[in-house]
Design a protein with these regions (language model features):
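Solenoidal tandem-repeat scaffolds enriched in leucines and small polar residues
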Residues: 184-186
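Sec-dependent N-terminal signal peptides
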Residues: 4-14
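Gram-negative (and chloroplast) outer-membrane scaffold detector with strong preference
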Residues: 65-143, 150-156, 188-193
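C-terminal segment of classical bacterial N-terminal signal peptides
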Residues: 14-20
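Sequence/structural signature of outer-membrane beta-barrel proteins
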Residues: 50-58, 88-94, 126-133, 166-173
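Short glycine/proline- and aromatic-enriched beta-strand/turn motifs that initiate or cap beta-hairpins
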Residues: 20-75, 188-193
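Internal, hydrophobic beta-strand segments that form the core of beta-sheet-rich folds
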Residues: 162-163
Length: 193
């Protein structure tokens, strides 16, 4: 009886091979993969260091320093939104220090060619300014930026950028209004994730 069940089990197992057939169509994959360095949902942190140049102070301020940290998230392959916090200083001819802390939000458009990326930013925000123990907050800030970065790996890119700041000061007495214009040149590191 045991032999009968063993032979029946072997016979039924091998009989399935009689009904097996080959797939003549072969393997076909419908998806096409195209490499793009950035896609919707990708993010990056950036850190920059550089110099800031006063443009319309007629020799009253010297070249200063600037550092910033920012976060951006891609909405598509080319468009991202995010914000940036900067800190800069300039020294006057009277050895007084102008300190500015702008916090901006905006959008970035970034075309690329191979591993080279060319971000262009437009941002607006508020700044805290300190000058001769006077603190001015909030001050309106607009910033336009452009740069060129090289993607070393999928996670790291390095490059250079320039920022143009317009920081107006408006008072009740309009004769005292002033438009502060600054340009910066920076080197930067970006971490993509």
């Amino acid at each position: 009886m045991k032999r009968f069940f063993s032979l029946l089990l072997i016979f039924l197992t091998l009989s399935t091979l009689l009904f097996a057939q080959e797939d003549d169509e072969g393997f076909y994959e419908d998806d096409v993969y195209v490499y793009a360095p950035n896609g919707a949902g990708d993010q990056f942190l950036k850190i920059t260091l550089g110099a800031i140049f006063p443009l319309n102070f007629k020799g009253q301020l010297s070249t200063g320093g600037k550092a910033s940290i920012g976060y951006f998230r891609f909405l598509s392959e080319y468009l991202a939104v995010g914000g940036e916090l900067s800190a800069s200083y300039n020294v006057s001819i009277g050895e007084k220090v102008l300190v500015m802390l702008p916090f901006t939000f905006g959008a970035m458009f970034q075309p690329y060619i191979g591993r080279f990326e060319f971000p262009v930013y437009a941002e607006i925000g508020l700044a805290n300014q300190t000058w001769q123990n006077m603190e001015i907050f909030p001050t309106f800030v607009t910033k336009l930026s452009a740069g060129a970065y090289f993607r070393i790996t999928d996670s790291i890119s390095i490059g250079a950028s320039t920022d143009f700041f317009w920081i107006p000061q408006w008072f009740k007495d309009s004769s005292k209004n002033f438009n502060g214009l600054f340009e910066s040149a920076e080197i930067g590191l970006r971490y993509h994730f």
